[in-house]
Amino acid sequence: MKTAFRSVLALGLLLGLFLTASTALAADAKNVEATPQAKVYRASLKAIDTGDYAAYTKCMTSEAVKEIEKQTKEMGKTPKDGMEMMKMMAPSDIKLTDLKVDGKKAVLSATGKQDKETMYGTVNLEEEKGEWKVGKQSWTNKKS
């Protein structure tokens, strides 16, 4: 009788731990938006949408800013032109689905829409001078 009771108690504890862990994982997915990484990424999207180049560069890593300025110059475009191009190319309805942080680096996973097609994005972020910044990002229509 004691053995059966212990087995039921142990099973109950394991089930409780499993439910707690799975609830925590679900909560983590919902809380991606509350993270500093998501906030800086959303700020970069807002800057693109409004065409605010100064605000955009504040959200980006120093390396990403150098690359953007180099590409814009090579194309003979102004920063404003570059912002318009980014706005046209950016997916809409972006939903952040996952975040993995490893020290001063992080990767956001996202989905969005482009021409009515679901796109899957990976956004690399880095911590610079105590602030999270957006680095390179890539979007594809194939789920990885």
Residue ranges and their predicted role:
Residues 121-126:
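Hydrophobic/aromatic beta-strand elements that line small-molecule binding cavities or substrate pockets
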Residues 12, 21-50:
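Short, low-complexity N-terminal intrinsically disordered segments enriched in polar/charged residues
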Residues 51-67:
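Short, well-ordered alpha-helical segments enriched in acidic and aromatic residues
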Residues 27-33, 39, 74-120, 139-144:
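Surface-exposed, charged secondary-structure patches
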Residues 68-72:
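Short, charge-rich amphipathic alpha-helical segments embedded
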Residues 1-12:
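Bacterial N-terminal signal peptides that target proteins for export
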